[in-house]
Regions:
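Conformationally flexible catalytic loops at phosphate/diphosphate-handling active centers
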Residues: 1-44
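Short helix-loop-beta junction
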Residues: 24-27, 35, 67-82
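Solvent-exposed alpha-helices and their adjacent loops that cap or buttress functional pockets
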Residues: 45-49, 98-100, 152-155
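Redox- and metal-dependent alpha/beta enzyme cores, enriched for Fe-S-associated oxidoreductases
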Residues: 50-78, 91-96
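Short beta->alpha junction loops
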Residues: 83-89, 163-166
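A structural-propensity feature for long, helix-poor, extended segments
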Residues: 93-114
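Peripheral docking tails and interdomain loops at the edges
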Residues: 107-170
C-alpha cells in the first residue's frame, strides 16, 4: 500500500460519503417508518421539551432511563428528560446540540470504562458537540463554523456529568 494513495483515499471519503450520510439516513428512516409503522430518528427524545436535566445514552438502557425520568418527575418534582442516540456514526451533533441547549445538567451514561481516558467515548462526542455550539455562538451568524449546529451563548452550556454502568453485569 502506498502511503500517499492511502491518505488520499481516506481524505477523499469525507466529501463523497460523510457529507451525505445524514440526509440519506433520515430518508431511509422515513421510508422504513412508511413500510413498517415503526418510526426511528437519529436522536430520539423523551419528555425533553420542559426538562432541566437530561440523561443521554444509547441502547437498552433507554427504557430504564425513561422510567427514572418519570420517577424523578413524580417523586422529586425534577424535570428530567432522556435523549436516546440511536445512531453513533456519524455522530448526530447537529440534533444533539439543539436538544441540549439551555439545559441545567446532562448526565452521559455509557456501558464502558476507559480508566486512563479523559472522557468515555460518548462523553467525548457530547463535549465536542457542545464546544462546536459555543464556537458557533462566538462567530457572526453568517460565519458560523458549524452551520447545522445550534449556536450557544455562555449560559446555554449545561453542566456535564459522566457515568458508566453494566460492567460485569453490575
Amino acid at each position: 500500500q502506498i502511503q500517499d494513495a492511502y491518505m488520499q483515499a481516506t481524505a477523499g471519503q469525507r466529501p463523497y460519503f460523510f457529507d451525505h450520510i445524514e440526509a440519506i439516513t433520515d430518508t431511509c428512516l422515513a421510508e422504513y417508518a412508511g413500510l413498517t409503522g415503526r418510526s426511528y430518528q437519529r436522536v430520539a427524545t423523551f419528555k425533553l421539551e420542559d426538562a432541566d436535566y437530561v440523561i443521554v445514552g444509547m441502547g437498552s438502557m433507554i427504557v430504564q432511563a425513561e422510567c427514572v425520568a418519570d420517577y424523578l418527575r413524580e417523586t422529586r418534582k425534577l424535570k428530567v428528560g432522556v435523549v436516546n442516540l440511536t445512531m453513533f456514526r456519524p455522530f448526530p451533533g447537529d440534533l444533539l446540540g439543539h436538544a441540549l441547549r439551555g439545559k441545567k445538567g446532562v448526565v452521559v451514561l455509557e456501558r464502558t470504562d476507559q480508566p486512563l481516558a479523559e472522557d468515555l467515548p460518548l462523553m467525548r462526542e457530547v463535549r465536542a458537540t457542545l464546544i462546536k455550539c459555543i464556537e458557533n455562538g462566538m462567530a457572526p451568524d453568517d460565519e458560523r463554523p458549524f452551520p447545522t449546529y445550534a449556536s450557544y451563548a455562555a449560559g446555554d452550556m449545561p453542566r456535564l456529568y459522566s457515568g458508566c454502568y453494566g460492567l460485569g453485569s453490575r
